[in-house]
Amino acid sequence: RGNSIYTIVDGPSWTEAEANSNKLGGNLVTINDKEEYSWGSDNVWSSQNYVANGFNEETMSYLGFNDKDIEGNYQWSSGEETEWNNLTDLIVAQNWFSQKQHFDGWDYGMIFANRDFEIEGTDARYTPYQNRGNIVLMDDNGSFYRNSGSNIVGIAETKFIRRGDSAYVIVEGPTWEEAEANANKLGGHLVTINDAE
């Protein structure tokens, strides 16, 4: 989408999923606006995408959303500014309305498969509410969900430069083999220079 490649990365914890995203030259996904939120629910954190990539359809994903540095100061791990007026509006209704007492230990954002931004709230326990996201706050390991048997991965978003029909990304790799493996995870290879241009 645009100049980003979205890739599922290993996510034993939010911190490790972010590190795995960094190896691919990116960060855990940043949701910039309602349009990207809807697109992501249909294409990135969708059951169909998970199944196509060998995961079960109820897989959850870590996002770049967090307040790990300063409690209550939500940001994206990419450091990007987004079109949201208030990032707390992205927190799922149950967390926001009933579980704020846990927020000191819940610093990392996750999302269930297929979840989109809600223009009109759908959780009957908290309706009426409007314009709320579905980002679940949890500890670094997603302990509650992981201990309940949920599969959790990360969604990496890597910016690229397009030239012709190629996309160029800087990936991490202390060795050629590791750099090539990271390029493969994005569906490509290390660069081939075809001519002087």
Task: Kindly label every feature range from the protein language model.
Residues 1-197:
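Extracellular, disulfide-bonded carbohydrate-recognition/adhesion ectodomains
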